[in-house]
């Protein structure tokens, strides 16, 4: 297969990532809801002496339409593409690697006689490809999360990254090179879940549709298989994605204890403070983004493969 699979997967991933970036940004904002420290208001009753009562205001939770509307109202239409340069770099590193490796592994593990590959092998191939791709693309992933989340912070706390390269440079200077791999274990776990469920589901659903003669090998089959794969990937990865987003977004200041000690600590604190369903926070925008992302990804991939079919590299 050589570099061909990497090029095909990379082109399709960049197109899909950029076209669904606003939905991904809304998902990140929703996943960070409820994370900030409660607002404290000192209330003094009319007949009180020199005492005060501290009231913790409950965290405001807003739905996907509310988050999107507030984002446009407060930050402008351009804010919907905050961090898109990081998305391009992330797809170039992460998705190009995982798509190319999956193609190579699938070619090696496919039965030469039947031209088929068992579901468990597809899942294994996806997990391996996803893990390696995530390790390569983690710096861009951290930068993307921070750039997408920056607008929700007070003006004095914003990082104001100019681009993905500026974000990476500032992280190295201020927090050390290891900050580029903050949350990498979560990124790898999420990538293994997403890639194995997404690519294996797509291949399996597509094969089933063609075998049963439900549809011909065309746009209808590609869209149907892609939509199913996107939903499966969303269900499998959302809990890890919430924790990953929070760990990557946390601000580390010298001499001050970070909000979370690690992934497990973040998960425990999140569930304790916001309930078990908080792990599926942002699920609607996740599905809303993952389904069209997967559809655009595989439909574009099928077309790119047709363009490259006469070329070998």
Swiss-Prot record:
Annotated organism of origin: Arabidopsis thaliana
Subcellular locations according to the entry: Mitochondrion inner membrane
One GO cellular component term: mitochondrial inner membrane
Gene Ontology MF terms: dicarboxylic acid transmembrane transporter activity; oxidative phosphorylation uncoupler activity
Role: PUMPS are mitochondrial transporter proteins that create proton leaks across the inner mitochondrial membrane, thus uncoupling oxidative phosphorylation. This leads to a decrease in the efficiency of oxidative phosphorylation and an increase in heat production. May be involved in protecting plant cells against oxidative stress damage. Recombinant PUMP5, reconstituted into liposomes, transports a wide range of dicarboxylic acids including malate, oxaloacetate and succinate as well as phosphate, sulfate and thiosulfate.
One Pfam family matching this protein: Mito_carr
Keyword Transmembrane helix annotated: yes
Family in the record: Belongs to the mitochondrial carrier (TC 2.A.29) family.
Transmembrane segments annotated in the record for this chain: 6-26, 77-97, 123-143, 182-202, 223-243, 280-300
Highest classification ranks of the organism: Eukaryota, Viridiplantae, Streptophyta, Embryophyta, Tracheophyta
Gene field: PUMP5
UniProt topology in membrane: Multi-pass membrane protein
Tissue specificity of this protein: Expressed in roots, leaves, stems and flowers.
Entry protein name: Mitochondrial uncoupling protein 5
């Amino acid at each position: 297969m050589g570099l061909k699979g990497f090029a095909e997967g990379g082109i399709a991933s960049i197109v899909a990532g950029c076209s669904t970036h606003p939905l991904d940004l809304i998902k990140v904002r929703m996943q960070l809801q409820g994370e900030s420290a409660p607002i404290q208001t000192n209330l003094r009753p009319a007949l009180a002496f020199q005492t005060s009562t501290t009231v913790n205001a409950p965290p405001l939770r807003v739905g996907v339409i509310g988050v999107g509307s507030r984002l446009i109202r407060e930050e402008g239409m351009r804010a919907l593409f905050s961090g898109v340069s990081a998305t391009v770099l992330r797809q170039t590193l992460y998705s190009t690697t995982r798509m190319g490796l999956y193609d190579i592994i699938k070619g090696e593990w496919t039965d030469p006689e039947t031209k088929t590959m068992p579901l468990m092998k597809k899942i294994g191939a996806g997990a391996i490809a996803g893990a390696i791709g995530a390790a390569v693309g983690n710096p861009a992933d951290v930068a993307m999360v921070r750039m997408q989340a920056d607008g929700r912070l007070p003006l004095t706390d914003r990082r104001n990254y100019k681009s993905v390269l500026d974000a990476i440079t500032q992280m190295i200077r201020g927090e050390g090179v290891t900050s580029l791999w903050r949350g990498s274990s979560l990124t790898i776990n999420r990538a293994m879940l997403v890639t194995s469920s997404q690519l294996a589901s797509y291949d399996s659903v597509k094969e089933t549709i063609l075998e049963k003669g439900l549809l011909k090998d065309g746009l209808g089959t590609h869209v149907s298989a892609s939509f199913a794969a996107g939903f499966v990937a969303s269900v499998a990865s959302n809990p890890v994605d919430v924790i990953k987003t929070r760990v990557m977004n946390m601000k580390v200041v010298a001499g001050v204890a970070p909000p979370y000690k690690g992934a497990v600590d973040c998960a425990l604190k999140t569930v304790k403070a916001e309930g078990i369903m908080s792990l599926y926070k942002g699920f609607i925008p996740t599905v809303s983004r993952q389904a069209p992302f997967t559809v655009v990804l595989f439909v574009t991939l099928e077309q790119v493969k047709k363009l490259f079919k006469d070329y070998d590299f």
